Swiss-Prot record:
Cofactor: Mg(2+)
Residues binding substrate, per UniProt: 313-319
Main location: cytoplasm
GO biological process, any: IMP metabolic process
Cofactor note (record): Binds 1 Mg(2+) ion per subunit.
EC assignment: 6.3.4.4
Function of the protein: Plays an important role in the de novo pathway of purine nucleotide biosynthesis. Catalyzes the first committed step in the biosynthesis of AMP from IMP.
Organism from which the protein derives: Methylibium petroleiphilum (strain ATCC BAA-1232 / LMG 22953 / PM1)
Domain of life per record: Bacteria
Amino-acid positions noted as binding Mg(2+) in the UniProt annotation, renumbered to this chain: 20, 47
A GO MF term: magnesium ion binding
Protein's recorded name: Adenylosuccinate synthetase
Pathway field: Purine metabolism; AMP biosynthesis via de novo pathway; AMP from IMP: step 1/2
Length: 444
């Protein structure tokens, strides 16, 4: 690990679209300059795919910095933790030769995801579908119900695992409530107390050595001159407050939550890097103004889907694909206060004869230049496009701006101009070395 260029200089990485922007690769690349990486929201519904020397590694809950020797990995209080999944992820990494337990620290304040959260999540989606209401598109991993318990002040937290009697009492009360919902409203089967409690006590013994006061550790890292990287999950347009509600996730995915979700002040967030695909994708339901049809071979949508290998890391579901939506990007820049952008998957556009970018919308006979807040209005939006000539040369693996095809550079320059934020990095392939650096987040 190289020394940080500026003592205590912290970087926040957030997705600016509907997730799957390629944050994992960028975080892994930036970790060269970080002493620690922090997850601050979401759960194991978030997939982070890293490709290192041609080998693909998929992470869901553990910070992407785990693939770098000597880097501390923190799971902040804003994350909901499924202990069984977490241990499974640890075991898979350690079986592959990655040391995890000595470097992973989990906030005691994290809410727990337990089996009844998963069952409620799945039963709700099934009920929505059968009633004709339409799915929200959750991953079915219990994330939403766990956050509901947190907000209702009844959640079991990681710290409760240290106190078996307290855990048992709270679990009985919580299980009674969720069984009432499962049986009475969702027409699903109730769960039994003993297996849930016994399993929790078993995993508790394995997790206890990794429990920590994450906020204090981050503060001490900065005081010692170390830099910290805050790794966001999902994307801004899935944020519970600022996304395309109700087709959103259950947490705040924006940069401001890096402070609240890890236990530090906002003054610790020095540089905000937004990750943006050179086009747009979305998994699951919800409005998507620049979406393209993908089924027909030879179409742009099919090209983006197949060349981009657009399937969800966690669910395996095909991602919906479309042109870059600069008007939606403007909303993300406004919310996050971005310092700079990293454009990913530029290489997927190689070979297209024409490239389009959504620069605004027509809504009820008027032109608007930023994504509306109302999901029904977004559905009614007709995108306004600018067109660009494509390029025939390959951008795969390019590491210098001047080596990009001229039309690729012109496209990126126009993206930068329309959205009003500087492009500081460009990703030209899945491997960490496939990166063009224009301004370093740890030096800018």
């Amino acid at each position: 690990m190289q020394a940080a260029s500026k003592a205590g200089h912290n970087v926040v990485v957030v997705g600016t679209q509907w997730g799957d922007e390629g944050k994992g690769k960028v975080v892994d690349w930036l970790t060269d300059h970080a002493a620690a990486v922090v997850r601050f929201q979401g759960g194991h519904n978030a997939g982070h795919t890293l490709v290192i020397k041609g080998k693909k590694t998929a992470l869901q809950l553990i910070p992407s910095g785990v693939m770098r020797d000597g880097v501390a990995c923190y799971i902040g209080n804003g994350v909901v933790v499924d202990p069984a999944h977490l241990l499974g992820e640890i075991e898979r990494l350690e079986a592959a030769g990655v040391e995890v337990r000595s470097r992973l620290f989990i906030s005691e304040s994290c809410p727990l995801i337990l089996p009844f959260h998963v069952e409620v999540d799945k039963a709700r989606e099934a009920l929505r579908e059968s009633s004709g209401a339409g799915k929200i598109g959750t991953t079915g991993k219990g994330i939403g119900p766990a956050y509901e318990d947190k907000v209702a002040r009844r959640a079991l937290r990681v710290q409760d695992l240290k106190h078996p009697d307290r855990f048992a009492k709270k679990l009985r009360d919580l299980l009674e409530l969720h069984n009432f919902v499962l049986q009475g409203f969702l027409k699903a089967e109730a769960l039994e107390f003993p297996p849930i409690f016994d399993h929790a006590m078993n995993v508790a013994e394995q997790l206890k050595p990794m429990l920590a006061d994450v906020g204090v550790r981050i503060h001490e890292t900065n005081l010692a001159g170390g830099s910290v990287l805050f790794e966001g999950a999902q994307g801004t347009l899935l944020d519970i407050d600022h996304g395309t509600y109700p087709y959103v996730t259950s947490s705040n995915c924006v940069a401001g939550n890096a402070a609240a979700g890890s236990g530090v002040g906002p003054d610790k967030l020095h540089y905000i890097l937004g990750i943006t695909k050179a086009y747009t994708t979305r998994v699951g339901s919800g409005p998507f103004p620049t979406e393209l049809p993908m089924d027909e071979p030879g179409t742009v949508g099919h090209h983006l889907s197949t060349v981009g290998q657009e399937r969800g890391t966690v669910t395996g579901r095909p991602r919906r694909c479309g042109w870059l939506d600069a008007a939606a990007m403007k909303r993300s820049i406004l919310i996050n206060g971005l310092t700079g952008l990293c454009i990913t998957k530029l290489d997927v556009l190689d070979g297209l004869t024409e490239i389009k970018m959504g620069v605004g919308y027509e809504l009820d006979g008027r032109r608007i230049d930023i994504l509306p807040l109302d999901a029904d209005e977004i559905v009614a939006c007709k995108p306004v496009y600018e067109s660009f000539p494509g390029w025939t040369g390959s951008t795969v693996g390019t590491t210098r701006w001047d080596d990009l095809p001229l039309n690729a550079r012109r496209y990126l320059e126009r993206v930068q101009e329309v959205i009003g934020a500087p492009i500081d990095m460009v990703s030209t392939g899945p491997d960490r070395e496939h990166t063009i650096l224009l301004r370093h987040p740890y030096q800018g």
